[in-house]
Amino acid sequence: MTDETETPERIPNLLVILGATASGKTRLGVQLAGRLNGEIISADSRQVYCGMDIGTGKDLHEYQGIPYHLIDVAPAGHEFNLFQFQRLFLAAFTDICSRGAFPVLVGGSGMYLDCVLRGYRLTEVPQDPALREELAPLSMDELASRLVRSNPRLHNSTDLTERARLIRAIEIAEYRGEAGDDWPELTPLTIGIRWERAQLRERITKRLKERMEQGMVEEVERLHAMGTSWEQLEFYGLEYRYLARYLKGELSRNDMFQKLNSAIHDFAKKQENWFRKMQTNGIAINWVEGNSDPLAQALELLAKNR
């Protein structure tokens, strides 16, 4: 990861705290929120689920009265998607700002962070039978011209090569034009917390042992007993996948722990790779060192940007 620090040109209206699993990002986010009259918005793809507490590391005791959003917003077994996250983020961001508080986005789910920081335009656009009937007699060139008129900022030229994709692109572009764009203008300050690889591995293994002692096996048993299928638990990955296999008798307890521990280490590497990709794509991440008072480093960054 680069050591370069880039800062926003305008005063931030969103603080983003990101990092790999077990990096201490939640603790840092809560500490900063407490000093900023802030509220936490979670950017974790599994913490949205009710009852999936220990395995997802909600660690709600760390919040110490700081309000939080996008945790426990969907039932276990439900498939929560990126569009739903973005819609709920927008609602939470708007609500927090309207009350004069400061939004602090905290998480490690790269796609969720990316969709906020890069402003993905995700819209649930219904099919428009009348529009499709109108477009049906048009040639490919005529359809392409209409799409460019509807979306002058078109960047994805692949939409121009297949008729069905072209019609759908027009449908989306014209729907958005009528509905307007309610995405806020964000000026984020993004802070990442990182550790040396060996230190992070040690933290991951230590935390996994603690979660096992806290009742993570029983949590998965309870979720299954309440109707979350083994297949759904498998879908949620990592802790839920390997504990489900253990509970089904496919793995011994020792094998389950070793395989899960290894999988979490691999996941942390993938997160770090995603953050590098975010930087390559132009997102400025200001890194603080986890083993050297990350709060003081983050406060120094905030002082320079407020």
Swiss-Prot record:
Region described as Interaction with substrate tRNA: spans on this chain: 44-47
Binding residues annotated for substrate, in chain numbering: T21, A22, S23, G24, K25, T26
Catalytic reaction list: adenosine(37) in tRNA + dimethylallyl diphosphate = N(6)-dimethylallyladenosine(37) in tRNA + diphosphate
GO molecular function terms attached to this record: ATP binding; tRNA dimethylallyltransferase activity
Residues annotated as site: Interaction with substrate tRNA: S109
Amino acids binding ATP: G19, A20, T21, A22, S23, G24, K25, T26
Signal peptide range: none
Keywords on record: ATP-binding, Magnesium, Nucleotide-binding, Transferase, tRNA processing
Cofactors, names only: Mg(2+)
Entry EC no(s): 2.5.1.75
UniProt keyword annotation of ATP-binding present: yes
Short name of any one Pfam family annotated for the protein: IPPT
Organism superkingdom: Bacteria
Recorded family membership: Belongs to the IPP transferase family.
Stated role: Catalyzes the transfer of a dimethylallyl group onto the adenine at position 37 in tRNAs that read codons beginning with uridine, leading to the formation of N6-(dimethylallyl)adenosine (i(6)A).
Subunit structure of this chain's protein: Monomer.
Listed name of the protein: tRNA dimethylallyltransferase 2
Lineage: Bacteria, Pseudomonadati, Thermodesulfobacteriota, Desulfuromonadia, Geobacterales
Gene behind the chain: miaA2
